[in-house]
């Protein structure tokens, strides 16, 4: 999996590409840890090129959401493809995360 990190204004954008599973979650954990060094981090996770997410990937996102909330930050997700969106729906994660169809609408929610 590839992780691209960029910052636009005060929003940290994490773009995921490939598969997020048990073999790749450590890299995403490190990325989140770096961002959580700042209190109140605003994070947009762009999933446009995320092909698959496993339960390990879901746990990573859930842990990040909890850490973000503790630090008065916020995480939103954008551009989930149909397969990934279905995994979020089946697992109930659509109730946990704010999910948007575009980066622009996700950024506006931050």
Model segments located where?
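Short beta-strand/loop segment at the start of cytosolic alpha/beta domains
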Residues: 1-15
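Conserved catalytic submotifs in the C-terminal HATPase_c
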Residues: 8-10, 48, 104
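Amphipathic alpha-helical interaction surfaces in cytosolic regulatory modules
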Residues: 22-96
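Acidic phosphotransfer microenvironment of two-component signaling modules
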Residues: 82, 104-105
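Short acidic-hydrophobic, aromatic-tinged amphipathic segments that line or gate anion-handling sites
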Residues: 98-102
């Amino acid at each position: 999996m590839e992780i691209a990190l960029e910052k636009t204004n005060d929003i940290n954008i994490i773009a995921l590409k490939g598969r997020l599973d048990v073999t790749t979650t450590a890299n995403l954990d490190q990325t989140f840890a770096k961002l959580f060094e700042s209190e109140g981090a605003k994070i947009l996770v762009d999933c446009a090129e995320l092909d698959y997410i496993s339960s390990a990937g879901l746990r990573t996102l859930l842990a990040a959401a909890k850490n973000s909330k503790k630090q008065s930050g916020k995480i939103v997700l954008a551009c989930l493809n149909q397969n990934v969106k279905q995994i979020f729906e089946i697992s109930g994660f659509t109730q946990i995360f704010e999910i948007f169809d575009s980066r622009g609408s996700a950024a506006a929610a931050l």
